[in-house]
Amino acid sequence: MEKYERIRVVGRGAFGIVHLCLRKADQKLVIIKQIPVEQMTKEERQAAQNECQVLKLLNHPNVIEYYENFLEDKALMIAMEYAPGGTLAEFIQKRCNSLLEEETILHFFVQILLALHHVHTHLILHRDLKTQNILLDKHRMVVKIGDFGISKILSSKSKAYTVVGTPCYISPELCEGKPYNQKSDIWALGCVLYELASLKRAFEAANLPALVLKIMSGTFAPISDRYSPELRQLVLSLLSLEPAQRPPLSHIMAQPLCIRALLNIHTDVGSVRMRRAEKCLTPGTPMAPGSTGSRATSARCRGVPRGPVRPAIPPPLSSVYAWGGGLSIPLRLPMPNTEVVQVAAGRTQKAGVTRSGRLILWEAPPLGTGGGTLLPGAVELPQPQFVSRFLEGQSGVTIKHVACGDLFTACLTDRGIIMTFGSGSNGCLGHGSLTDISQPTIVEALLGYEMVQVACGASHVLALSADGELFAWGRGDGGRLGLGTRESHNCPQQVPMVPGQEAQRVVCGIDCSMILTSPGRVLACGSNRFNKLGLDCLSLEEEPVPHQQVEEALSFTPLGSAPLDRETLLCVDLGTAHSAAVTASGACYTFGSNQHGQLGTSSRRVSRAPCRVQGLEGIKMVMVACGDAFTVAIGAEGEVYSWGKGARGRLGRRDEDAGLPRPVQLDETHPYTVTSVSCCHGNTLLAVRSVTDEPVPP
């Protein structure tokens, strides 16, 4: 809410509170709907998401304009246009028994007609059109329809099979259990027109059965005979019991009764009133007056050598180290004294989540402000510098997980909402476009679901819900989205799951994806180059014949290479051309390309069969992460090992390529536990937490 100033509460809707606010940038009054998502059911979340989705599609002067949505204090905030003239229902109520002029009725009616025509043109059903949802400008001359919470966007189906809306405006076919379609909105339009002409509802009764009986029989009092026969006939046609007999919107707009009012709308609304009477263009002809949107469980305590300890200086709550990208040894990143519980590395991003739920970012300082310059005669580049900052603009939002792709970031809140920001290339942000976004923005298509995890590849995203539903979006070539095609998508698509498999965790690679299921098995899709997904059907130490090699999978497929196909796997990660997995017993397996020794075997073998990493047999491993041509593994006691390509500091040591695991030394003087590790391209990010020697209370 940094961009807005609350003025007062103007209403309480079905799902939350409506605030009148001042937008600081231009001093414009706006309406902000505050919807407490933590108290909402899945259906209520879907309605809130639906209103955002519908309003973004619409752009019409007679439809309430949508500005943005964001999270604030555990609530979804939807900013939209403010209509200060109140509702049409209030306008009618204030008339008491003083009937409106027919010209005024038509002035309002044709604006509603234009708005509904715009809505239907976008294949949207309003489904709750009523005078309470029709708003007026400050002069009470311009009509704007709003409240699209239960609207229906029609895609492949032409009808909405749910009965919703206000009972007094429900059509006869809905009372019979038939589907809702455009003609049901036209019935509601007829109810609104009747209300304008009679100052009362067409159908009212003491109870619901009596109301349904009236609607089914089409029983309503005729409107006053002071109105033209054409207007009375229009009301009757709109309230025809048979949907087929109700005229379509285009026919209504073409009626002589409406044409003049429509012309006046386009010529008079917004015109400046003259102080003197206008002269007639033709003598003798009077002028018509103007119409009034952690990759694994933590490792246990790492025991460091017991040296002299200065108790006066307490250890930091946690430390985050980075190496690679020119950093040859682990660099402790600057940060406030807070505990970072999970980290994620992208092509250029370094991000973490604190225990208090804040998103922290590490960035290089602006050019010329840090890092020093290379002095004459120097043989080494100066140590790169980083500055930390908390992501601003998300007050009241608790982040519990972050994932990074190439130039974009996704984060998950404690309320199961996914937000993305950064580069919109390939549709990675999931907002239905390729537009870049600088601030975290809700992925509205997933508001109806409680999400529990999100993973980012270089150019695609997987997200998992609490009910085991899987969604994918972004670049799709190679089948990396698991949708059975190679098509790309810029908004979330539900992924079909293998029957009997319950997804527990998702992992994304450069051009592939994996799912860990509840029995500890793995499903994979995308590029299987070098058998980096383990999809080849292989027995132990067996090599496949060329025609048995699987090059790609368009849908999620169980692993076929022994021993991965029968081991219980706790952790997997995907590199550019290789992958690694940790079993329930703590063994570490690698598979894929071994060009740079990233598989951790004594020889640079060329094989498509998975192998167990050598040198780690006596150590129980709990985490593993893969970079472009190297691997990092974490032991149960906090040991950190790396192997593979050593260029530009990938291994966190000042040495060349290492085909076997070697330890990485961290600058820690207190016992610690590794809480999270993430590798991307040539970079590694690792978080550790200090462990005190005090006994843990029972």
UniProtKB/Swiss-Prot annotation:
User: What protein name applies here?
Assistant: Serine/threonine-protein kinase Nek8
Summarize where ATP binds, as residue positions: V10, G11, R12, G13, A14, F15, G16, I17, V18, K33
What does the UniProt record say this protein does? Required for renal tubular integrity. May regulate local cytoskeletal structure in kidney tubule epithelial cells. May regulate ciliary biogenesis through targeting of proteins to the cilia. Plays a role in organogenesis and is involved in the regulation of the Hippo signaling pathway.
Q: Where is this region: Disordered?
A: 281-307
- Family matches, as Pfam families: Pkinase, WD40_RLD
Q: Which UniProt keywords apply?
A: ATP-binding, Cell projection, Cilium, Cytoplasm, Cytoskeleton, Disease variant, Kinase, Magnesium, Metal-binding, Nucleotide-binding, Phosphoprotein, Repeat, Serine/threonine-protein kinase, Transferase
> What gene is it encoded by?
Nek8
Q: Which reaction does it catalyse?
A: L-seryl-[protein] + ATP = O-phospho-L-seryl-[protein] + ADP + H(+); L-threonyl-[protein] + ATP = O-phospho-L-threonyl-[protein] + ADP + H(+)
Cellular component (GO) terms are:
centrosome; ciliary base; ciliary inversin compartment; cilium; cytoplasm
Identify the catalytic residues.
D128
Primary location recorded for the protein, binned into one broad class:
cytoplasm
Gene3D superfamilies named in the record:
Phosphorylase Kinase, domain 1, Regulator of chromosome condensation 1/beta-lactamase-inhibitor protein II, Transferase(Phosphotransferase) domain 1
What quaternary structure, including any partners, is listed in this protein's UniProt entry?
Interacts with PKD2; may regulate PKD2 targeting to the cilium. Interacts with ANKS6. Component of a complex containing at least ANKS6, INVS, NEK8 and NPHP3. ANKS6 may organize complex assembly by linking INVS and NPHP3 to NEK8 and INVS may target it to the proximal ciliary axoneme. Interacts with ANKS3.
EC numbers listed for it are 2.7.11.1
**Cofactor(s), by name:** Mg(2+)
Q: Which PANTHER family match?
A: PROTEIN CBG16200, SERINE_THREONINE-PROTEIN KINASE NEK8
The keyword Transferase belongs to this UniProt entry's keyword annotation = yes
Alphabetical GO biological process terms: animal organ morphogenesis; determination of left/right symmetry; heart development; regulation of hippo signaling
From which organism does this entry originate? Rattus norvegicus
Q: Where are the RCC1 repeats?
A: 415-466, 467-518, 520-571, 585-636, 638-689
What does the record give as the organism's lineage?
A: Eukaryota, Metazoa, Chordata, Craniata, Vertebrata
